[in-house]
């Protein structure tokens, strides 16, 4: 099995922890992304690579009809329990099980690095009605904060602000226009004893040969920095970046 495929399949083993401990998408940011999409039951918002539904649930809470598309059955199970089987579909960015022009908007959170753009872009363009938007969202640890920077030195975490390069989200090309960037800073809180499970939801950590050493070092760093949280609660700073492009 190729390393990329091994990493892709690692998430299902930690689906419950992923669902509980991955950061939630900021509601204000998601509302701005979908502000003018005019979604209906016939033309919903489509969340591709939806995982266990962190982004899907925010879309739903804002009152937008939403359909989630996720290839991993283990990750899709929490989605189906929350949305119903008819709104949690097996598929991928390269193979979306919807008719032409079905989507008012398409979103994808923390997933573009798994995608083959040469297949995904025309497929997204197919299901998205003209004038609709495609948005790629990244949630990045803010390693401008000292203790988060130290954490990144001992744990294999790629999703951090200093690592991110705008080139990671290239221009989509035809039939899409240029990207518009929105971003928002926020903090996620969880119990310090949940930190190891939170970190295991990242494939680069879960599959590392020295994973237990990395997790022990992470707990030690949090303990050494009072500013990381209070009363046994970790306060992890993040920046969400959303890149939206309009379908011509």
Could you tell me what each predicted segment is?
Residues 1-40:
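Conserved class I S-adenosyl-L-methionine
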Residues 104-118:
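A short SAM/SAH-binding and catalytic strip from SAM-dependent methyltransferases
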Residues 94-106:
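A short acidic, Gly/Pro-enriched loop at the edge of an enzyme's catalytic core
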Residues 119-189:
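Conserved catalytic/acceptor-binding region of the Class I
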Residues 44-46, 52-95:
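Class I SAM-dependent methyltransferase SAM/SAH-binding core
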Residues 34, 57-60, 121, 125:
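A structural alpha-helix within SAM-dependent methyltransferase catalytic domains
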Residues 13, 17-18, 25, 32, ...:
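Tryptophan-centric aromatic hotspots in well-structured domains and transmembrane helices
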Residues 168-248:
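Conserved Class I S-adenosyl-L-methionine
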């Amino acid at each position: 099995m190729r390393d990329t495929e091994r990493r892709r399949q690692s998430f299902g083993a930690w689906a419950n922890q992923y669902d509980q401990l991955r950061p939630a998408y900021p509601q204000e940011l998601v509302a701005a992304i979908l502000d003018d999409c005019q979604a209906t039951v016939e033309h919903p918002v489509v969340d591709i690579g939806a995982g266990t539904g962190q982004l899907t649930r925010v879309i739903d809470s804002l009152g937008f009809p939403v359909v989630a598309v996720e290839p991993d059955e283990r990750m899709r199970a929490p989605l189906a329990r929350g949305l119903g089987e008819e709104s949690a579909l097996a598929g991928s960015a390269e193979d979306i099980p919807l008719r032409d022009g079905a989507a008012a908007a398409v979103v994808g959170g923390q997933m573009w690095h798994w995608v083959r753009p040469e297949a995904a872009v025309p497929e997204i363009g197919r299901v998205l009605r003209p004038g609709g938007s495609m948005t790629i969202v990244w949630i990045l640890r803010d390693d401008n904060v000292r203790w988060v920077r130290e954490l990144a030195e001992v744990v294999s975490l790629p999703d951090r602000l200093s690592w991110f390069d705008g080139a990671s989200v290239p221009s989509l090309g035809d039939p899409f226009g240029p990207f518009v960037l929105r971003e928002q800073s926020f903090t996620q809180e969880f119990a310090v004893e949940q930190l190891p499970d939170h970190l295991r939801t990242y494939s680069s950590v879960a599959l590392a040969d020295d994973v237990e050493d990395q997790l022990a070092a992470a707990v030690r760093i949090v303990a050494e920095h009072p500013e990381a949280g209070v009363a046994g609660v970790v306060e992890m700073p993040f920046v969400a970046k959303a890149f939206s492009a309009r379908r011509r």
